[in-house]
A protein has these predicted regions:
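Substrate-binding/gating loop at the entrance of the active-site cleft, primarily
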Residues: 1-14, 23
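Conserved PLP-binding catalytic core of the aspartate aminotransferase-like
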Residues: 179-180, 195-202
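Helix C-cap/helix->beta junction micro-motif
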Residues: 12, 72-73, 103
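Conserved core segment of the aminotransferase class I/II
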Residues: 98-177, 187-189
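Hydrophobic residues at beta-strand termini and immediately following loops
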Residues: 17-19, 96, 108
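Active-site phosphate-binding strand-loop segment of PLP-dependent enzymes
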Residues: 17, 22-92
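Hydrophobic/aromatic ligand-binding patch that stacks against planar heteroaromatic rings
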Residues: 7-9, 69, 116
């Protein structure tokens, strides 16, 4: 559970319902548990992939099963993919929208993690799927976006350079990279503590 999703849902008047992710299965979502929690009041499924805080990267099969649930129950998909470039050990990120072309999917991303500029508060939303069925929703998103002030001008220039330039995150997650070494050390030290288990983040 990433607390911002819980808080945002509650702030909007909704009731967040958490589904299980199983440590013994590499923190993959428990699809039976997820389906058991879907009710007529359920509006969407939030998928944080790569996951925060577990570090799990969901398989295409797992994502396909989540999409099948969303399709069966006519649910919106909310894909938090802010960690999509921070991958270790040949892990592969599969964008949720690519598995659900027939469903409305909102994908959230930004600069804060992969480009290490959290203070810029620069991000984006991509809406895919049958948008013709969500025109009023999309208009509402547009109104909300227009009510917000834009990032500062240097940050806007940084977005263009970051997305179009050298992807330096690769140097940090490959062998010898600082993020990979920190991940490995933290994982090793946690597992050395008696009674503590830790799945290696992907």
């Amino acid at each position: 559970d990433y607390p911002l999703w819980t808080a945002s849902t509650a702030l909007a008047g909704g009731t967040p319902v958490h589904y299980l992710c199983d440590e013994t299965d590499g923190w993959q979502p428990d699809l039976a548990d997820m389906e058991s929690k879907i009710t007529p009041q359920t509006k969407a499924i939030v998928v944080i992939n790569p996951n925060n805080p577990t570090g799990a990267v969901y398989t295409r099969e797992t994502l396909g099963r989540i999409v099948a649930l969303a399709r069966k129950h006519q649910l919106l998909l909310l894909a938090d993919e802010i960690y999509d470039k921070i991958l270790y050990d040949d892990a592969t990120h599969v964008p949720l929208a690519s598995v659900a072309p027939d469903l409305l999917c909102l994908t959230f991303n930004g600069l804060s993690k992969a480009y290490r500029v959290a203070g810029y508060r620069a991000g984006w939303l991509v809406i895919t799927g049958p948008t013709e069925h969500a025109t009023s929703f999309i208009e509402g998103i547009g109104l909300l976006a227009n009510m917000r002030l834009c990032p500062n001008v240097p940050a806007q220039h940084a977005i263009q350079v970051a997305l179009g330039g050298h992807q330096s995150i690769d140097d940090l997650v490959l062998p010898g990279g600082r993020l990979l070494e920190q991940r490995d050390l933290a994982w090793m030290k946690l597992n050395e503590i008696p009674g503590v288990s830790c799945v290696k983040p992907e």
